[in-house]
Amino acid sequence: MLDVNFFDELRIGLASAEDIRNWSYGEVKKPETINYRTLKPEKDGLFCEKIFGPTRDWECYCGKYKRVRFKGIICERCGVEVTRAKVRRERMGHIELAAPVTHIWYFKGVPSRLGYLLDLAPKDLEKIIYFAAYVIVGVDEELRHNELSTLEAEMQVEKKTVADQRDADLEARAQKLEADIAELEAEGAKSDVRRKVKDGGEREMRQLRDRAQRELDRLDEIWTTFTKLSVKQLIIDELLYRELVDRYGEYFTGAMGAESIQILMQNFDLDAEAESLRETIRSGKGQKKLRALKRLKVVAAFQTNGNSPMGMVLNAVPVIPPELRPMVQLDGGRFATSDLNDLYRRVINRNNRLKRLIDLGAPEIIVNNEKRMLQESVDALFDNGRRGRPVTGPGNRPLKSLSDLLKGKQGRFRQNLLGKRVDYSGRSVIVVGPQLKLHQCGLPKLMALELFKPFVMKRLVDLNHAQNIKSAKRMVERKRVQVWDVLEEVIAEHPVLLNRAPTLHRLGIQAFEPQLVEGKAIQLHPLVCEAFNADFDGDQMAVHLPLSAEAQAEARILMLSSNNILSPASGRPLAMPRLDMVTGLFHLTRLDEGVTGELVAPTNDEAEQGVYSSPAEAQMAVDRGALSVQAQIKVRLTQQRPPRDLENELFPEGWKYGDGWTATTTLGRVLFNELLPADYPFVNEQMPKKRQATIINDLAERYPMIVVAQTVDKLKDVGFYWATRSGVTVSISDVLVPPEKPAIIEDFEAQADKIEKQYQRGALDKKERNSALVTIWQEATDKVGKAMEAHFPDSNPIPMIVKSGAAGNMTQVRSLAGMKGLVTNPKGEFIPRPIKSSFKEGLTVLEYFINTHGARKGLADTALRTADSGYLTRRLVDVSQDVIVREVDCGTERGIVTTIAEKQADGTMIRDAHVETSTYARTLAADAVDANGTVIVERGHDLGDPAIDALLEAGITTVKVRSVLTCTTGTGVCATCYGRSMATGKLVDIGEAVGIVAAQSIGEPGTQLTMRTFHQGGVAGDDITGGLPRVQELFEARVPKGKAPIADVTGRVQLEDGDRFYKITIVPDDGGEEVVYDKLSKRQRLRVFKHADGRESLLADGDHVEVGQQLMEGAADPHEVLRVMGPRQVQIHLVNEVQEVYRSQGVSIHDKHIEVIVRQMLRRVTIIDSGATEFLPGSLTERAEFESANRRVVAEGGEPAAGRPVLMGITKASLATDSWLSAASFQETTRVLTDAAINCRSDKLIGLKENVIIGKLIPAGTGINRYRNIQVQPTEEARAAAYAVPSYDDQYYSPDGFGQNTGAAVPLDDYGFSNDYR
């Protein structure tokens, strides 16, 4: 077998019959499979041992040679080579066909490659191949020309003979008629009898004339057909063809079936054809030119790559190895077989019958019919169902052909090559493990023992608990006492990977150090649930074991959960307290008035109450019941840093650990601050979830990850502790309906009745009534909600859970305790009848029914969304999988300008709302200079929160930052343009697969995006697409629904207002040609423009517009933006539009992820004029390739090619990738492979998918070349220390040391054990 690590590219091409015979180990002659009595393969059959190799290791068919010592001998009795049985997985056979057949992929694919090559319409091709028409394959022009006059004279003579014969016959008949009539007259017959005789005679004469005319016409047709005969001409009329052959057989040759195609191919001159096509393209117009371009693609492909077009017609069919189409015996003694065997059997049967017919010299019509059937059977084998009805097996199920084995989710690519199952894995239900540290998980003992079995066995032998591996295995299986101690030792510091399906982003699989636990459930740390999207209602997780030292190191360094606190999408912490923990911390940091032991100012009689010298003293007071944790106290602190302003006041030199200061706070808050790093400023406020998030964010920005991990772990422990102490529970009696509710409802019901009456009087139409009612009831719901919030006491657990941010929101509480309000119907419109009851009071039947409307739609939507979102992620991954960080800095000067703040009218700076996702975590492309010319932040600096704060203080509003959109690295991107990795907070490493991270970051929140299309007020009909469909529309670069025109030029608007349409004319400022936009529907409103002074107005006659400005409401067509504004603007447009959708759902994704995808969409150029380059006009090519070819041509003094950038949707861009392996495994497998084979495409194995498919390490992370080509040389000391170990005797390094102490895996196959040993 060839080693995948030793080749750098993989080429695919057309196999000629010669190649097929060279691969083959023998010809399959019989359709038999195995003998029903002996169950051994039949000789020369589809499973023949002589061709494919022995079925048992080292054993020939007849049993003469058994055992490995006869290796390589070919048995003289049965002809089987003595070798391993696994050669039956790799040896191929072949079938010699009695007649050539065409390959269905090249004839039936769209477009038909055979048709393009031979310039035949697919319909005609089909007639030729399936024996419905003859085709002329050769004409002897010279001979025909020379003898044309002679032949013409002969033809004239023949025609004259026919005419003379006709005249003679007519003459004779006319005389006979005259004689008959004379005779009748003599007899005195009646006139009607005479007339009948006359009519009869004339009819016969007419028939004679017609017959002669037909004969003459036939001779004319034969002659004209013959004189105009040309190669590739079809003759459908069989009689005509036979006549031609009889008369003029020596002047031409004709044929039908694949043989004729083969002859045409042999006589085909590629170079001449390519030249004539190029000429047509140069001079032609319209359809003719287009067709020539398409044909030239195919012709040029064969011309340049040494592929012979003869490969499209087969004389031999390869037979794949039998182990890949096995036959297995089922329990009942019956056999299950692969469909391929049936398909091969049909081919062999028909082929053998055809051979016999040809030997017998059967009539041509019978032979042709058999050849057609052979063609159809080979078609079914290659691609069943592509033409005509598919061949079916038992139960009318179409058989799976070779193409079907590759296609689709269940095909070879996606099922076996890209998604393999792995050994050393297990799965179980998860339960919460609150006692674990962030980097730990609880692994059930039994599961751990099974997973670590080989390690335990080795260790048992090392420790002399067992004599050999076999007895160690027995010990483990019997679970002896020593085994558990050894297991404990083996799993120490050996990380395991936990994965929860669906793995939507890279945090769906993380590494943990296992802790052995009783029971059978895996214990999971509560803080990683967010990343895994796990809960404990029966979720299951899979465990995988990294085996090699390198794998363990990667798992520990890159994948350990405590190193993955930040989200790769936004760079914000994911491992944050949630639910119970939030409630606990919120309760702990509360400040209650009027509770035990609170601070009391000194009076004349008493000293100050509630003052403590240290937190420890306060804690003692709590323990003895004299103080509440939530009471306000004064306490002296020495181990916590004071807040910033206080620190500047008290400690001008800066606070040091141990400096004392007094805080007025609660003990709970002191306890909370003890969890934070000592030098973090004291936080003296209540802690809802948002505030906790801000603090952890801040820690992640300013402290090492290990500190953050320890801090969140402490927060988790304390959160759970105080959540328990807080006694927060929810019961039905906690749901309090506000007493004011009936009055409010009554008041608004009166208003609603008024509207209803107006409607019935006809003062309002239905639409007006509905919108008025909706307004009334929305107001009512708000009022009830406010009353309810006011009515809840502070101590009530429900508002506490909501206010702390642990779960739920006030709208949900309003449904429970206030009123549900208005609900929507499936169209997304409000139903004007509100639900006036709360869930506590209970709904009426009608209310219940109305409510189910929305609820069902929600569930249906979620199901659809999940599938759509998964497919979007798949396309995104596919388009961006080869974007890998390849170098540190591409050295470009370019960048994009981002806004970090806006100046208000009064001169104050307001931080831009989107700094988080646009400027943060990027690299500066140019020095940031303030108004005085001072450099605030230098070029090349990383923009973290501190740097952005510095820029804001200096009054800078915009900065130029590096971006992947402007990166000039050839393949992939450079680290500086990408900026910092969101997940680590440092500059991205070389080898990071940023493309896949980007795809995951965009795809993962996809499920949260709404499905529905929004109804914009007043826009009926033309819905504005939102949510997931809008994201798909943008990434697929489709023309949006309800597209808005954009201004092609800068100028003044002339607006004409028609009945149903607007007409907008723009008069350009530069005096150029006017641009007219006609037939703009009035259902789409004109665009609202914001003026500098804050006014808003609709686009009006005489307004001035800038180039690229939208003229109507709706979404601009990205292709238009590209045409008018250029590639950079369309990139920024797409990024902003995608962000719009995600922001509306409150999802934070950094712009750089969207930029990575958008960059892939604009990688190609359409060639307009090829100049002196090799490119074909109209073809798509990579921008880098285009530029390098142009540079080369210009250097040689030639004419460069002209091209224009083209925006491709992600599906199209994935299929257009340079890697045929990646494209074939994505979609349209047969089409991609057909194309790749004709063009003899070579896959450079640059992306990830191609390498996964062939089984190489992926060129990302530590698999990238610059990390792989490193050799470690031990120092002298290390060497001395290693060899000082006494047990390393020389014998261990001898060849038959059986793998002892070398650390190598023992290749058991090479030792002559019989099969049963394993």
Swiss-Prot record:
SMART domains: RPOLA_N (SM00663). It holds the Pfam family RNA_pol_Rpb1_1. Its cofactor is Mg(2+); Zn(2+). It catalyses: RNA(n) + a ribonucleoside 5'-triphosphate = RNA(n+1) + diphosphate. The RNAP catalytic core consists of 2 alpha, 1 beta, 1 beta' and 1 omega subunit. When a sigma factor is associated with the core the holoenzyme is formed, which can initiate transcription. PANTHER family: DNA-DIRECTED RNA POLYMERASE, DNA-DIRECTED RNA POLYMERASE SUBUNIT BETA. Binds 1 Mg(2+) ion per subunit. DNA-dependent RNA polymerase catalyzes the transcription of DNA into RNA using the four ribonucleoside triphosphates as substrates. Keywords: DNA-directed RNA polymerase, Magnesium, Metal-binding, Nucleotidyltransferase, Transcription, Transferase, Zinc. Zn(2+) 2 binds at residues 890, 967, 974, 977. CDD domains: RNAP_beta'_C, RNAP_beta'_N. GO terms for biological process: DNA-templated transcription. Its EC number is 2.7.7.6. This is DNA-directed RNA polymerase subunit beta'. Zn(2+) 1 binds at residues 60, 62, 75, 78. The gene is rpoC. Mg(2+) binds at residues 535, 537, 539. It comes from Rhodococcus erythropolis (strain PR4 / NBRC 100887). Belongs to the RNA polymerase beta' chain family. The lineage of its organism: Bacteria, Bacillati, Actinomycetota, Actinomycetes, Mycobacteriales. GO terms for cellular component: DNA-directed RNA polymerase complex. GO terms for molecular function: DNA binding; DNA-directed RNA polymerase activity; magnesium ion binding; zinc ion binding.
